[in-house]
A protein has these predicted regions:
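Class II aminoacyl-tRNA synthetase-like tRNA-binding/catalytic domains
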Residues: 2-235
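Extended, non-catalytic structural segments that build the interaction scaffolds
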Residues: 135-139, 273-279
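Generic non-transmembrane alpha-helical segments
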Residues: 146-154, 249-260
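Cytochrome P450 heme-thiolate monooxygenase catalytic core
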Residues: 158-160, 265-266, 325
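Acidic/polar loop patches that form or flank catalytic/metal-binding clefts of enzymes
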Residues: 159, 258-259, 300-303
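A translation/RNA-centric and nucleic-acid-associated enzymatic feature enriched
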Residues: 170, 174-252, 270, 277-361
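Flexible, glycine/charged-enriched surface loops at secondary-structure junctions
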Residues: 259-268
Length: 361
């Protein structure tokens, strides 16, 4: 006589492969409701969410009683049979045969009511368990994978620039300073560009990707004190070559997210149509042409002034995909930008402006 086979440990994203079989799941209780003789447990494990149905007659009495009082976010392990159900997320649910409470959680502070950002940031370690934050972080992870895969596949070498630096790259007014032993101040990096440029002279094509810090006090969606930035650098790449690389890179990353993150984009309420239009070639206009476009729309900018967020929004609204603005005046760009030999008052550089008012990429 053979002993019954033990339930197979699996994850929620793989349940559709186990319809009709006994499985074991470990996760956290996202929600719970009861109709007296049946508990409906919404369980998540990081890969997805599934409804687990527990009937009084199918499980030991103590397990059924324990489930009746489980607080949200309690951790548990359950075993049961996977059943096909087209109405359920993922097309399956689990009929529970046994339940083990690993840990009973404290009362969960994030309730269905509206909470302020300050409250949610104070509980950030719990907030990331929510459906929306979960989707944001999954999309972010896919963007990072897509970016590094693209550059690795095009012969770029990743180099890691220091986070503590001796000098400013983007101006001294936005530096975070710290004492560096008895050697004077050091600064949190604003950019790895200067290190990248040195590395490009050794390897030809390089990129760095890491945290960046700007001591900007403005509280807008365009200003962050800390963010992660990817910076490629290539030797012997002219302005047209740079723009061709940038548009192919951006289109590739957006296409990858559309391919692999449809579920997350739906969870975020993101209309995919504007993303589907992000395809090369991107429009290219000069700084002078940008000023004329702005003037036609009632925004007059003096020649030589940099373009701000409002101007970038107006320009990007004129196109249905990212747009390059190239050949800015030298006086409004960084010292390391190369002057145009045919017109030394402008530089051989370009900004890529995203549609929908997001501004410079």
């Amino acid at each position: 006589m053979t002993s019954p086979q033990a339930p197979q440990p699996t994850t929620i994203d793989r349940l559709a492969q186990h319809v009709g079989r006994e499985v074991e799941l470990s996760g956290w209780l996202a929600n719970r409701r009861s109709s007296g003789k049946i508990h409906f447990l919404l369980v998540r494990d990081g890969t997805g969410t599934v409804q687990a149905v527990m009937s009084r007659g199918d499980v030991p009495a103590e397990a059924f009683e324990a489930a009746d009082h489980l607080p949200q976010e309690s951790s548990l392990t359950l075993a049961g049979t996977v059943r096909a159900d087209p109405r359920a997320p993922g097309g399956v649910e689990v009929t529970v045969r046994s339940l083990c409470v690993v840990h009973q959680a404290e009362p969960y502070p994030i309730t269905p009511k509206e909470h302020g950002v300050e409250f949610l940031m104070d509980h950030r370690h719990l907030w990331i368990r929510s459906r929306r934050q979960h989707a944001i972080l999954r999309v972010r992870a896919e963007v990072i994978r897509a970016m590094t895969d693209y550059l690795d596949g095009h012969g770029y070498l990743r180099v890691d620039a220091p986070i503590l630096t001796p000098a400013a790259v983007e101006g001294t007014t936005t530096l975070f300073a710290t004492a560096y032993f008895d050697l004077g101040p050091a600064y949190l990096t604003q950019s790895g560009q200067l290190y990248n440029e040195a590395a490009a002279m050794a390897f030809g094509r390089v990129y760095c990707f890491g945290p960046t810090f700007r001591a900007e006090k403005s509280k807008t969606r365009r200003h962050l004190t800390e963010f992660w930035m990817l910076e490629p650098e290539a030797a012997f790449l002219d302005l047209d070559g740079y723009m061709a690389l940038a548009e192919d890179f951006v289109a590739s990353v957006v296409g990858r997210v559309l391919e692999r993150c449809r579920v997350e984009l739906r969870a975020l309420g993101r209309d995919p149509a504007p993303l589907e239009r992000v395809a090369a070639p991107f429009p290219r206009i000069s700084y002078d042409e940008a000023l004329r476009l702005l003037a036609e729309r009632g925004k007059v900018v003096a020649w030589g002034d940099d373009l701000g967020g409002d101007e970038e929004t107006v320009i990007s609204a004129a196109f249905d995909r990212p747009v390059f603005v190239h050949r800015y005046p030298a006086r409004c760009k960084a010292f390391y930008m190369q002057p145009d030999p045919a017109r030394p008052e402008v530089v051989l550089g370009a900004d890529l402006l995203a549609p929908e008012g997001y501004g410079e990429i």
